[in-house]
């Protein structure tokens, strides 16, 4: 079956819940060690003692389309019978000439069919068309499957925030990880 990616208008899709959740058996353990001459940081994949599940409910359903703080956001996705089945939302970061993927989600029934890749390609094309330096996104150090997908898509680690969600993110093994895909600079 072929799926068509369409523009999702703000008027129709604003505030639509994106039910992002996952179960993981692994995480990237991030350590930061202060040294006399600076810091040493390490991000190394490790296993949980038992699977960990994160649900939208535990975070009070934070992922929605066209949130007010994402100025000039745009969304594209797949809709079947008026139901959202997959989506990518992007928003420009004008001051740094970067484009941020604010949401990426594919319904479980459609995973493994290349839809995530196709959605990411639309974001990459938007970044190229707008002349952005970087396409970037946020995920969590415990979302190993997502990190693997993004690395496969050509993204690389550009940073992390060790207290984005709570003050003990490092201990909880849920650290905000920033990944970026760099566009080729014109010579």
Where do the model's predicted regions map?
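Acetyl-CoA-dependent GNAT
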Residues: 10, 16-98, 102, 107-108, ...
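Conserved acetyl-CoA-binding loop-helix of GNAT-fold acetyltransferases
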Residues: 103-106, 112-129, 148-152
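C-terminal "cap" of GNAT-fold acetyltransferases
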Residues: 2, 133, 140-144, 153-156, ...
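Conserved phosphate-binding and hydrolysis motifs of nucleotide-dependent enzymes
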Residues: 82, 86, 114-116, 154
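Residues that form or flank phosphate/diphosphate-binding pockets in enzymes
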Residues: 96, 114, 145
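Generic detector of contiguous secondary-structure segments
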Residues: 3-16, 132-147
């Amino acid at each position: 079956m072929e799926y068509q990616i369409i523009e999702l208008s703000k008027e129709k899709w604003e505030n639509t819940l994106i039910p992002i959740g996952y179960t993981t058996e692994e995480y990237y353990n991030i350590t930061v060690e202060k040294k006399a001459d600076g810091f040493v940081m390490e991000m190394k994949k490790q296993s949980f003692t038992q699977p960990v599940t994160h649900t939208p409910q535990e975070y009070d359903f934070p992922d929605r389309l066209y949130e007010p703080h994402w100025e000039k956001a745009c969304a594209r996705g797949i809709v079947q019978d008026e139901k959202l089945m997959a989506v990518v939302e992007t928003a420009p970061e004008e001051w740094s000439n970067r484009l941020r993927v604010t949401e990426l989600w594919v319904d479980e029934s459609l995973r493994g069919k290349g839809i995530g890749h196709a959605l990411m390609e639309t974001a990459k094309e938007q970044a190229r068309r707008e002349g952005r330096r970087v396409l970037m996104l946020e995920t969590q150090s415990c979302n190993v499957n997502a990190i693997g997908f993004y690395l496969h898509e050509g993204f690389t680690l550009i940073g992390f925030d060790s207290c984005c969600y709570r003050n003990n993110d490092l201990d909880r093994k849920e650290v905000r990880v920033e990944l970026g895909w760099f566009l080729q600079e014109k010579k």
